[in-house]
Every structure is written in structure tokens, then in C-alpha cells.
Design a protein with these regions (language model features):
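Active-site cofactor/cluster-binding pocket
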Residues: 1-166
Length: 166
């Protein structure tokens, strides 16, 4: 959810693109599988949810099973390869693997896995200038300045991973 919110806020506040953010909460709200949809478009957005997605970011196995069928042919699938198998049963999508859980633990804080994956996504897709995304993260974490260096390192690591898989 954090990853989607950062992406939507950065795009909405700093570009001329149209953006929707649609979170889905349920029993999963505290630590389980939750999801959100972010739509970024140069055109007006008629509905916040579509039937087919261009890009899909998957952080766990249950999310892969639930949402992989909605990824369009030729779409980009970003997986947390620390815990999600790359045996996805589809050869018609571009697979971008990032061991974000492992990297976050190596950095000393599992919570930065979302920021690493955000960096992977932005680095791979170039959907938005990374500097704009980082400004949004800085703003969101302004009340917790001690978290900024670790999150900066996490975001930059993700950018490097994403760019390296283009």
C-alpha cells in the first residue's frame, strides 16, 4: 500500500498526468495481503480500476495467484523474488525480479522493502522522474528524519536493480 501511495502522490503532485489511487482494505489490513490499484494516464481516467493491467507489482505468492491473470500480454511483472517463485506459468510478460525482502533485511529494516521495490519499478519503467519520487518520500517521512538515510539507500538500490533489468 505504501509503495502505491508514494507513486500516486509523486505523480499527482509533480506531473501533468492524471492519477487515481484505489486501496483495497479488508481483513488483510494489518500485515496480510492487501492491494491497491494506481492508474497513471495522459488521458482522463474514466474508472479507477481496469480489467487489464500494464504493470503488476507482486510482493507475495497469494497476490501473484490473484492478480497475474489481470496482467496484459506484454505487461511488466515485478516480483519480490525473495519469497515469490519466478515459475509464473506465463511467457508473454516481462518478468522483473528483485529480492527486496532479502535486501531490506541486509539493510537492517524489513520495512524498506516497499521503497526498494518502488525504486525497481521507477528505475525499470521510467514512468516518473526518480527525483520527484524521492521528494515525495522525503515529504512523507519529514516527521521521522532518522529514517531518511536508510530509505534513500533503499530507493537508490531499487533504482539500480530496475535500470539493470531494462
Amino acid at each position: 500500500m505504501t509503495l502505491g501511495k508514494f507513486l500516486a502522490d509523486a505523480t499527482c503532485n509533480s506531473t501533468d498526468k492524471n492519477v487515481t489511487f484505489f486501496p483495497s482494505y479488508g481483513a488483510e489490513q494489518r500485515g496480510g495481503t492487501a492491494n491497491c490499484f494506481v492508474v497513471i494516464s495522459d488521458e482522463a481516467i474514466g474508472a479507477p480500476l481496469g480489467d487489464v493491467m500494464d504493470d503488476l507489482i507482486v510482493m507475495n505468492g497469494p497476490s501473484l495467484a490473484k492478480f497475474l491473470p489481470t496482467l496484459k500480454q506484454g505487461g511488466n511483472l515485478f516480483i519480490n523474488s525473495s519469497i515469490v517463485s519466478d515459475d509464473i506459468g506465463r511467457s508473454d510478460v516481462k518478468l522483473v525480479k528483485a529480492p527486496v525482502t532479502e535486501l531490506a533485511l541486509e539493510m537492517g529494516n524489513a520495512k524498506v522493502l516497499n521503497v526498494i521495490m518502488l525504486g525497481v519499478y521507477v528505475g525499470y519503467t521510467e514512468v516518473i522522474d526518480p527525483a520527484i519520487v524521492w521528494e515525495t518520500i522525503e515529504h512523507k517521512l519529514a516527521s521521522k528524519p532518522k529514517l531518511l538515510p536508510l530509505n534513500k539507500q533503499a530507493f537508490e538500490k531499487g533504482l539500480e536493480l530496475g535500470r539493470g533489468q531494462r
